[in-house]
Amino acid sequence: MSPQTETKASVGFKAGVKDYKLTYYTPDYETKDTDILAAFRVTPQPGVPPEEAGAAVAAESSTGTWTTVWTDGLTSLDRYKGRCYGIEPVAGEENQYIAYVAYPLDLFEEGSVTNMFTSIVGNVFGFKALRALRLEDLRIPTSYIKTFQGPPHGIQVERDKLNKYGRPLLGCTIKPKLGLSAKNYGRAVYECLRGGLDFTKDDENVNSQPFMRWRDRFLFCAEAIFKSQAETGEIKGHYLNATAGTCEEMIKRAVFARELGVPIVMHDYLTGGFTANTSLAHYCRDNGLLLHIHRAMHAVIDRQKNHGMHFRVLAKALRLSGGDHIHAGTVVGKLEGEREITLGFVDLLRDDYVEKDRSRGIYFTQDWVSLPGVLPVASGGIHVWHMPALTEIFGDDSVLQFGGGTLGHPWGNAPGAVANRVALEACVQARNEGRDLAREGNEIIREASKWSPELAAACEVWKEIKFEFPAMD
């Protein structure tokens, strides 16, 4: 061993393993406006103190590793390390805690959701000292938000493009989701748009399969859009799914959609990945395309109460990465969504400033500094009887999407669309007249059905349909 190395070892470096809490648990730390703040639900292994578990999360998601290393001395750990600055027990849960962690902004690449998630929800989720770990919320500092483009256009620009104001937008997912030829698919699109819907939608797993290649689908759907626009005098759209196996192919599909003159494309942002999504969002802003986002695969990440990541974090990440619409549950249909929690992340998608509110699952006040908002999309097992509740819960700035609730109408696709449009217009008018949609909703729908045989038929078909299961979270 050289004399120089001996001197270094004697004054600073001590090999071995030490408790994380000695370095990464700092309860006296005062958070900075530039810190990214995280709230983790931590379930330690038996015998692991909560402070050690919280510190381990801070370490493993920032600068730490399992042992002391020489190169710690070559940088300033105090500047770059994550810090667990608070631990609180979860009410009603044994051996479960909320650990608050602050990350210095310099740990993250500007404008990269991919890099942010690689650190914060990376290897730490497989850490043996933890039985389970869930990221409940993030506070994104304004200085970091300003490095992102965000949604391609946002709510107001979309309304201006569509010339539609004062009501939720109506959509429909074309079913069956797989197996139709491009021409038959386009026919269903035309019938739904002609009947009164604003949008129709590719299902998330419609890409470019042998039974319907993407270019054929784009052509027939564009024809359906323009034909229905000419007949109704309204601007229409179909979410053309540009998701593909490579980013290059995805952009090629978006370019073709722009050349056809359609208003909107679609992306599966979790299966496609944040890098691909951000690239597509940039293309859409530069070329005047709206971007609809589907959250396929989200339940793999967010459904377990004790492990993974809450959807509100995925929603915040999407607003940074870019999207004009995103699916957000319904509260009332077949897909999970508890009302106050759902409205919490709906506000995080739409509003410019959201106050901390633990009753709605919001752990931090979030200032979006005028980043454009995202329209929440309610879809999954909804039909005309749900229209009053959906109108009340989601308000005007939303998309209400009825797949089976349109195409399952006994008289066909166009009458199904008519039924939904009449129900929506009736609910909006009743609300504007001061009526209570929550109490009078069924009566409002029945009154409207007297003047719309299409709505009356829909009411009869779905009068007994309910999806009643306990919520997971």
From Swiss-Prot:
Q: Which residues carry the post-translational modification N6-carboxylysine, per the record? A: 201
Name the InterPro entries on file: RuBisCO, RuBisCo_large_chain_AS, RuBisCO_lsu_C, RuBisCO_lsu_C_sf, RuBisCO_lsu_fd_N, RuBisCO_lsu_N_sf, RuBisCO_lsuI
Q: Which UniProt keywords apply?
A: Acetylation, Calvin cycle, Carbon dioxide fixation, Chloroplast, Disulfide bond, Lyase, Magnesium, Metal-binding, Methylation, Monooxygenase, Oxidoreductase, Photorespiration, Photosynthesis, Plastid
Record PTM text: The disulfide bond which can form in the large chain dimeric partners within the hexadecamer appears to be associated with oxidative stress and protein turnover.
Q: Where does Mg(2+) bind?
A: 201, 203-204
List locations, semicolon-separated: Plastid, Chloroplast
Name the cofactor(s).
Mg(2+)
| Reactions catalysed, as given in the entry | 2 (2R)-3-phosphoglycerate + 2 H(+) = D-ribulose 1,5-bisphosphate + CO2 + H2O; D-ribulose 1,5-bisphosphate + O2 = 2-phosphoglycolate + (2R)-3-phosphoglycerate + 2 H(+)
UniProt keyword annotation of Oxidoreductase present: yes
GO terms (BP aspect): photorespiration; reductive pentose-phosphate cycle
Q: Name one Pfam family in it.
A: RuBisCO_large
Q: Which residues carry this modification: N-acetylproline?
A: 3
> Catalytic positions?
175, 294
Note on cofactor: Binds 1 Mg(2+) ion per subunit.
Which positions carry N6,N6,N6-trimethyllysine? Answer: 14
Q: Which residues form the propeptide?
A: 1-2
Site (Transition state stabilizer): give the residues: 334
Q: What does this protein do?
A: RuBisCO catalyzes two reactions: the carboxylation of D-ribulose 1,5-bisphosphate, the primary event in carbon dioxide fixation, as well as the oxidative fragmentation of the pentose substrate in the photorespiration process. Both reactions occur simultaneously and in competition at the same active site.
Q: How does it assemble?
A: Heterohexadecamer of 8 large chains and 8 small chains; disulfide-linked. The disulfide link is formed within the large subunit homodimers.
Tell me what else is known.
The basic functional RuBisCO is composed of a large chain homodimer in a 'head-to-tail' conformation. In form I RuBisCO this homodimer is arranged in a barrel-like tetramer with the small subunits forming a tetrameric 'cap' on each end of the 'barrel'.
- Name assigned to this protein: Ribulose bisphosphate carboxylase large chain
What species is this protein from? Sesbania sesban (Egyptian riverhemp)
